[in-house]
Amino acid sequence: MTQDQLKQAVAQAAVDFILPKLDDKSIVGVGTGSTANCFIDALAQHKGAFDGAVASSEATAARLKGHGIPVYELNTVSNLEFYVDGADESDEHLNLIKGGGAALTREKIVAAVAQTFICIADASKLVPVLGAFPLPVEVIPMARSHVARQLVKLGGDPVYREGVLTDNGNIILDVHNLQITNPVELEAQINAIVGVVTNGLFAARPADLLLLGTSEGVKTLKAE
């Protein structure tokens, strides 16, 4: 199977997982990126089965609306049963690196609210140790140099992602060469740097379920 076919398979698996648990009042949290887009397209076939969605980015909101799915502001939603999103890396404990698409802050907020966080990814994203994929950090623009110096002290090699502004108007530093053996601790350390909005480690709030697309079919992993 191609990578696109794997993405479509896990997207459909996520729809199949949540659909029996939805009703006409349900609101679904939706992530950002190519795998999340596959989920949106699959979910749209059943848009009469739920009320609407909360989007983690402007791009996701536009795609949902294009399918005729109502999009709600998170502040108006009291209960979010599911959040479905892709990942750039996952370990066996379902700690994730996310943010390749620069939507990490809003993704992290929606994940924090959701009762169940379902990660959908192809098998190449499952790794023994996080960090081969550069860790994105969202930074207030005036703090860029300060934050970069602090990230070097933590052992990383931060690179400014040129030409990219987040939906919140901030910049991204991608931190290379990290061996992330304690993701919960590193997430907290980076977030404690003045000027950091958040970083792409989802470890304090990892995924609850990982639907992994493999050549043998979709495998379901739960956090160990």
Curated annotation (Swiss-Prot):
Enzyme class, spelled out: isomerase
GO biological process, one term: D-ribose metabolic process
GO molecular function annotation: ribose-5-phosphate isomerase activity
Organism, as annotated: Pseudomonas fluorescens (strain Pf0-1)
Gene Ontology CC terms, in alphabetical order: cytosol
Family per similarity comment: Belongs to the ribose 5-phosphate isomerase family.
CDD domains recorded: RPI_A (cd01398)
EC numbers for this chain: 5.3.1.6
Gene3D superfamilies membership: 3.30.70.260, 3.40.50.1360
Pfam families registered for this protein in UniProt: Rib_5-P_isom_A
Gene name, Swiss-Prot/TrEMBL: rpiA
Keyword vocabulary terms for this entry: Isomerase
Keyword presence, Isomerase: yes
Annotated InterPro entries: NagB/RpiA_transferase-like, Ribose5P_isomerase_typA_subgr, Ribose5P_isomerase_type_A
Pathway as given in its UniProt record: Carbohydrate degradation; pentose phosphate pathway; D-ribose 5-phosphate from D-ribulose 5-phosphate (non-oxidative stage): step 1/1
Reported function: Catalyzes the reversible conversion of ribose-5-phosphate to ribulose 5-phosphate.
NCBIfam families, per database record: PRK00702.1 (NF001924), rpiA (TIGR00021)
Catalytic activity, as annotated: aldehydo-D-ribose 5-phosphate = D-ribulose 5-phosphate
Summary of subunit composition and partner proteins: Homodimer.
Residue numbers annotated as active site: E107
Keyword Isomerase: yes
Residue positions binding substrate: T32, G33, S34, T35, D85, G86, A87, D88, K98, G99, G100, G101, K125
Annotated protein name in UniProt: Ribose-5-phosphate isomerase A
Chain segments annotated as transmembrane: none
